[in-house]
Amino acid sequence: NPDSKALIIGADIAKYGLNTPGEVTQGGGAVAMLVSANPKLLSFEGGSTYLSRNIMDFWRPLGHSEALVDGKYSSNVYLDFFNNVYSNYKDKTGFTIDNFEALLFHLPYTKMGLKALREAQKDADAKVSAKLTHRFEDSRLYNRQVGNLYTGSLYLSLLSLLENNDDLKSGDRLGLFSYGSGAQGEFFAML
């Protein structure tokens, strides 16, 4: 039914063992969004690029309450997936970094998104780079307070940007990178 609204909920708990490298990144929470055919706040621009591979960088074995992770490898996979889907998105749409007013990321920890942003900024002039960095800082404020939400972290970043940035305008294009270890990645835009 195209006139219906849908409630989308992303909830998870990121729990790691005591004194493990992942302990400092753990968190828990949920993000809920109302999606409709006639949005009042943001709309999907249409089209995305995505990548999926079977990669054992992060997993929770059956019967275990805590995840296992190869942190450095997982970080490298994240950046590889971002570079792949972002590059493919630019090729597909003809956009450059100049077409985005902000880039938002899945944030297992906030430095990870900064690393991906720096990858994207390799093609940016100083003014665009400064704008994107400023908006990234606005987008990661809540993630720094809450910790890793897993499935909800990208949308917590979006909420943080919208609530903490005062210079975005209606119709500004936001680029979003969604990611999940194991691994899947998607890049899409919202207006």
Indicate residue ranges for each PLM-predicted region.
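Claisen-condensing/thiolase-fold acyl-transfer catalytic domains that form or cleave C-C bonds
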Residues: 1, 107-191
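Short coil/turn connectors at secondary-structure junctions
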Residues: 2-6, 27-30, 37-40, 99-100, ...
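Short beta-strand segments
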Residues: 6-12, 34-35, 106, 176-179
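Acyl-CoA/ACP chain-elongation machinery
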Residues: 9-10, 53-67, 108-114, 144
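Condensing-enzyme catalytic core mediating Claisen C-C bond formation in acyl metabolism
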Residues: 15, 20-80, 183-191
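Cysteine-centered functional microenvironments
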Residues: 19-23, 68-74, 101, 136-149, ...
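Phosphate/pyrophosphate-binding loops at sites that engage ATP/ADP/AMP, CoA/4′-phosphopantetheine
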Residues: 83-101, 161-167
